[in-house]
Amino acid sequence: MVPEINIPPQLETRIAARFPAARLVSLHSELGDAARSRHWRAAHSGEARIVLGTRLAVFTPMPVLGLIIVDEEHDTSFKQQDGLRYSARDLAVYRARQNDIPVVLGSATPSLESWANATGNGGRERYHLLSLGGRAVPGAGLPAIRCIDTRVDRLHDGLTTPLLSAIESRLARGEQSLLFLNRRG
């Protein structure tokens, strides 16, 4: 399961190349009704061995379900806010428990709830914590992080002077800058 609708096409290619003998289908809201029905039936019959999808995929019946993977488990996109409210991540954990199969909750920045379930209190861990031994790119270091107190460095059009200076110096060197904002729209 993936949090965003734009992820399945990229991941679908990689998974299909890695598991060429297994039929893979995707399930997400961008599929037309006919394609979604075809993919759902393939999963339900067991013809499709791998289902890749957004939170909708958690409801797909699969006769020989053996593993559930939730990529970026911390992402709020797994929570349905309208109508019937649910957390697809929590439903995936429940389904795995009911089917006595493993579930992998993957994240470089796990939710506090998952972190607490993995690190536990006095030996009461509910999840088994696995960590990567190194960086995805060998030799890559961690980025430099600087916290800026906006009570001291005032905002100018939403950006602080140190941030504006850092962007200007990168642009002067012909480099790019990417700003992540914590809101949508």
Indicate where each model-derived feature is located.
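Conserved Walker A/P-loop ATP-binding site and its immediately adjacent core
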Residues: 1-17
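Conserved RecA-like ASCE P-loop NTPase motor core of nucleic-acid helicases/translocases
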Residues: 1-4, 25-27, 176-182
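Switch/connector loops and helix/strand junctions flanking conserved nucleotide-binding motifs
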Residues: 8-10, 33-37, 60-61, 76-79, ...
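Conserved interdomain linker/interface between the two RecA-like ATPase lobes of SF2 helicase motors
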Residues: 89-185
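Short, ordered loop/turn segments at secondary-structure junctions
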Residues: 3-4, 29-30, 56, 73-74, ...
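Flexible beta-alpha connector loops of hexameric P-loop NTPases
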Residues: 25-33, 75-86, 151-157
